[in-house]
Amino acid sequence: MKFLCVLLLLLSPAREAHYFPNIVYGQILIGAGTSRYETVFTLVAARETRATLGVFTDKGEPMNASFVDAQGRPAGTGSSFECYLVADRPVQIRLALAPDDAGDDVAVKTGWATIQSSAELEISAVVRITTPDGKLLTRHVLASQKPPIGE
């Protein structure tokens, strides 16, 4: 299934595709608070364009997530999120648990993501782990890779 999804990305006409093989988001209850895991994407385009972020399970199935903006406001829920980019203005998208999963004490989702656009994008991606009071515990930079072929 993962191969088929990536193959469809490659066959899309004039679309730039970025592949991130390891994403994580969720929460773990620790004592009186909850540690949060989030993957944060920052997208920048040289010209106006649309971009689509898709998230998938390790088996290649669409994965449900909440997409949150830089101010922490929910921007959408589902397995994909489309946004409009203005030239040279960064857009930040954070992955968070969907409302159905947010009530669990331990809920951590892992998988992979793609970002597609008809224009060239600069993308940075990091996984952040924070304490219940919001302090940063660790941060890992994610590199975009070429989509796998023949997996």
Residue ranges of model-derived segments:
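Short amphipathic alpha-helical segments that mediate assembly, nucleic-acid/protein binding
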Residues: 1-4, 136
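Sec-dependent N-terminal signal peptides
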Residues: 3-12
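Gly/Pro-rich, tryptophan- and cysteine-flecked surface segments typical
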Residues: 13-151
